[in-house]
């Protein structure tokens, strides 16, 4: 049976050269959005050459955020861009890594599936990669596959060989190669250099892949003679040398790529006709971005503030809420690993505490939560941010001595936060990767709560990624002191939402709402947060009379 017998979709393979982090994921997402706007069904996938099974245990400082899918996949952040640009939910099967391929390969070898054969990279590894590429097309007209890394990386070679084989077996009528490269600007004269692109294409061609379209990343379009030079020496049509220009907003990319006929050239390659794309919604987004008049400053207190890819979905969700509310969001990044001073918080209009792991930077986050609580500053805590809000309240309001999380101190007197019951270590091997509570869950909200009003419903579905939870033994004592637990999980009875109803806007959620926000449908929790930040700022409700020095953090002595 040939590949064509099992898959009728066209394949668009997006590769990158010269350097990493050029924007392959956004280019792939933009292609998907443009084809979707012409009436086609699309599916996007990411192939990562690293040997981790998934990015779940990788440092955000190296890899960026871990994007969680509805079905519990811990995936590359590019899948978040795919979802935001196309509105098509991805799954854990849309992100494959070399580690996962080798895991499957070795399991098959141990079962005897290769009995009698010498297991090799070619054909056994490449066959598994090809199987992933072709699987579960769900009736898509186009499957867009982004290959992580850079052409020339040793670890990328099996993936590049796999897509070469797919193209050979399907024929050029069903595959197209889009290669993104860098055209650097060198010297004080600002000379644009095309030689790195030529070498990158030469490297790709040596592996049996001839790019059909070259996207060159640059601050400005190349002069015609330089564009023609790339076409000539890289063996592509001059019409297929297309700029991938720096833009102020990523949401300008589909409009820009269409203006340079990227989608037109792709369809021409396949000999397919289609109506012009309806880009009205993209134009509307850009109008909203440009028309925001009110400005608020929101402090994000985290430990990866030098690596902003760690918070991609978070900052995008803030921007979505802001653009739909006519508000420009200025983010003030505060490194929680450094001493957080009152001067870091005195000029902010809102505080956001993101998720995280480990005790590094916890005191800075707790101090910021306490300062926001005591001074009427809107505060949104997500995942660990919610857990720390409960700990801060226990220390400073309920006066519970040595209130803490067992993640940070197993021997604390008052464990406000504990490991999920079904994850607590017992006999045998303890696996860290892939063992958290992951994916979409159903939550029930108190009918009279602020958060139910925000959602307009008492039953919601959100994505989670956590190993720890609020200790139910402390629910009553914290409620007696004024903290409300207004959301519970449908299946396990866990505390999922807390709020302080005496505060202008103070909400913590165990789940990750940022994963379900889009530029066309901002998440209601972020919208409420941003709008209340502006309203409270304009009304002057924040008094900022309580000093940050008065806030107790874990390990502090409680003064009765």
Curated annotation (Swiss-Prot):
Which reaction does this enzyme catalyse, per its entry? UTP + L-glutamine + ATP + H2O = CTP + L-glutamate + ADP + phosphate + 2 H(+); L-glutamine + H2O = L-glutamate + NH4(+); UTP + NH4(+) + ATP = CTP + ADP + phosphate + 2 H(+)
| Enzyme Commission (EC) number | 6.3.4.2
Cellular compartments per GO CC: cytosol
Could you say which residues bind CTP here?
20, 153-155, 193-198, 229
Please name the GO terms that the record assigns under molecular function. Answer: ATP binding; CTP synthase activity; glutaminase activity; identical protein binding; metal ion binding
Instruction: Indicate whether Transport appears among the record's keywords.
Output: no
What does UniProt list as catalytic?
Answer: 383, 512, 514
Q: Which residue numbers delimit the Glutamine amidotransferase type-1 domain?
A: 297-539
How the protein is activated or inhibited is described as: Allosterically activated by GTP, when glutamine is the substrate; GTP has no effect on the reaction when ammonia is the substrate. The allosteric effector GTP functions by stabilizing the protein conformation that binds the tetrahedral intermediate(s) formed during glutamine hydrolysis. Inhibited by the product CTP, via allosteric rather than competitive inhibition.
- The entry marks the following residues as binding Mg(2+), namely 78, 146
Query: Would you say which domain of life the source belongs to?
Result: Bacteria
For UTP, which residues are the binding ones?
20, 193-198, 229
Task: Tell me if Metal-binding is a UniProt keyword of this record.
Answer: yes
What this chain does, per the entry, is described as: Catalyzes the ATP-dependent amination of UTP to CTP with either L-glutamine or ammonia as the source of nitrogen. Regulates intracellular CTP levels through interactions with the four ribonucleotide triphosphates.
Quaternary structure and partners: Homotetramer.
- Descriptive protein name: CTP synthase
Q: Say which species the protein is native to.
A: Anaplasma marginale (strain Florida)
What is the phylogenetic placement of the source species in the record?
Answer: Bacteria, Pseudomonadati, Pseudomonadota, Alphaproteobacteria, Rickettsiales
Q: Which gene encodes it?
A: pyrG
């Amino acid at each position: 049976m040939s590949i064509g017998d099992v898959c009728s979709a066209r394949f668009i393979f997006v590769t990158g050269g010269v350097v990493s982090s050029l924007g392959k994921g956004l280019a792939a997402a933009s292609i998907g959005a443009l084809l979707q706007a012409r009436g086609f069904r699309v599916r996007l996938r990411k192939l990562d050459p690293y040997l981790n099974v998934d990015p779940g245990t990788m440092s955000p400082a190296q890899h960026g955020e871990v994007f969680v899918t509805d079905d519990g996949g811990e995936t590359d952040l590019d899948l978040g861009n795919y979802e935001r640009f196309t509105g098509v939910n991805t799954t854990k099967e849309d992100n494959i890594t070399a580690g996962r391929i080798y895991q499957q390969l070795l399991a098959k070898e141990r079962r005897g599936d290769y009995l009698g054969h010498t297991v090799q990279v070619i054909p056994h590894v490449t066959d598994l990669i090809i199987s992933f590429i072709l699987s579960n097309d769900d009736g898509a007209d186009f499957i867009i596959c982004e290959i992580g890394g850079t052409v020339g990386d040793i670890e990328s070679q099996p993936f590049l060989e796999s897509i070469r084989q797919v193209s050979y077996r399907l024929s050029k009528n069903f595959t197209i190669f889009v290669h993104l490269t860098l055209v650097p600007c060198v010297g004080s004269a600002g000379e644009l250099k095309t030689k790195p692109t030529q070498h990158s294409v030469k490297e790709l061609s040596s592996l049996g892949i001839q790019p059909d379209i070259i996207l060159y990343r640059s601050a400005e379009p190349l002069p015609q003679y330089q564009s023609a030079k790339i076409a000539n020496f890289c063996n592509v049509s001059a019409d297929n040398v297309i700029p991938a220009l720096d833009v102020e907003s990523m949401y300008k990319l589909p409009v820009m790529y269409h203006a340079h006929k990227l989608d037109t050239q792709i369809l021409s390659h396949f000999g397919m006709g289609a109506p012009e794309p309806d880009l009205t919604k993209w134009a509307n987004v850009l109008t909203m971005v440009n028309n925001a008049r009110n400005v608020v400053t929101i402090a994000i207190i985290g430990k990866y503030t030098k690596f902003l890819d760690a918070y991609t979905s978070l900052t995008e969700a803030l921007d979505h809420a802001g653009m739909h509310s006519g508000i420009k969001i200025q983010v003030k990044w505060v490194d929680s690993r450094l001493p957080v001073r009152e001067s870091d918080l005195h000029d902010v209009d809102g505080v956001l505490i993101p998720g995280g792991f480990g005790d590094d930077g916890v005191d800075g986050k707790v101090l910021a939560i306490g300062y926001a609580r005591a001074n009427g500053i809107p505060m949104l805590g997500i995942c660990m941010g919610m857990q720390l809000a409960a700990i801060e309240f226990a220390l400073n309001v309920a006066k519970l001595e040595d209130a803490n999380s067992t993640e940070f101190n197993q021997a604390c007197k008052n464990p406000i936060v504990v490991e999920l019951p079904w994850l607590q270590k017992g006999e045998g091997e303890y696996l860290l990767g892939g063992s958290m509570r992951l994916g979409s869950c159903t939550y029930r909200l108190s009918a009279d709560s602020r958060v139910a009003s925000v959602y307009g419903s008492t039953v919601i579905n959100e994505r989670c990624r956590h190993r720890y939870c609020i200790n139910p033994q402390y629910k009553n004592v914290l409620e007696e002191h004024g903290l409300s637990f207004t959301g519970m999980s449908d299946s396990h009875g866990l505390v999922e939402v807390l709020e302080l109803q005496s505060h202008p806007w103070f909400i913590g959620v165990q789940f990750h709402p940022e994963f379900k926000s889009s530029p066309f449908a901002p998440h209601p929790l972020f919208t409420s947060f941003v709008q209340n930040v502006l309203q409270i700022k304009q009304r002057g409700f924040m008094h900022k009379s309580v000093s940050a020095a008065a806030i107790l953090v874990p390990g502090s002595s409680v003064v009765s």
